[in-house]
Amino acid sequence: MRGDGDGWYKGPGGVKHWGKFGAAGLLLRAPLPGGGSAVLLQHRAPWSHQGGTWALPGGARDSHESPEHAAVREAEEEAGIAADDLRVRAERLTMTAPSGWTYITVIADADKPLPTVANRESAELAWVPEDEVADLPLHPGFAAAWIELRAVPLRVRLDADTELADALPRTVELPDQGFFWLHARDDGPGAEVVLDGEPTEGPVLTRADVIA
């Protein structure tokens, strides 16, 4: 039922977390002109829990919702982002409380920094360059998770591969290596990676990783 997840989940010792069935948030990336990426962040309204901090659009999951459904819905409600304007890439469990309560971050990409419409839960919304996110006063939970959510930029050599060019830029998650922001700007940030090349000290990527 819509809205049945709103409320505090009370764990042992009276510790509370918002969302009776857990919570989810959307980490939405978009390309910047120089090849880097920006992340959509919400400056939380002063009256809200941890008001004045920066975090992801997100909130309580309803009983019938998947984490993806909840995160995308919350982004539309809190930031005016339509589901058709993003592509989900991955999910990451970013918090588990002793009570069993969980927070899941859904990672997605947009083709460009989209216009936003703030609701009453936001003091403002902003597309923040990825390398500047950690400089903001972040919500404690998001600050702890950002270390594993941040994407490292990599430059992909296209070699006239049009299918590959159409797939970039984008976020990719590699097992045991984390997230990477792939782009094709020769003068953009990050090291160059050769797809399907010989193993190096850096991340090993295949063409299939990019066009998946």
Describe each PLM feature range:
Residues V88-R92, P153-R155, P189-L195:
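Compositionally biased accessory segments in Actinobacterial proteins
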Residues D6-P12, R157-A160, V172:
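Short, Lys/Arg-rich amphipathic segments at extreme N-termini
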Residues E163-A212:
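Nuclease catalytic cores that cleave nucleic-acid phosphodiester bonds
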Residues M1-T53, G59-L114, E130-D131, R150-V152, ...:
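N-terminal leader/linker segments that precede catalytic domains of diphosphate-processing enzymes
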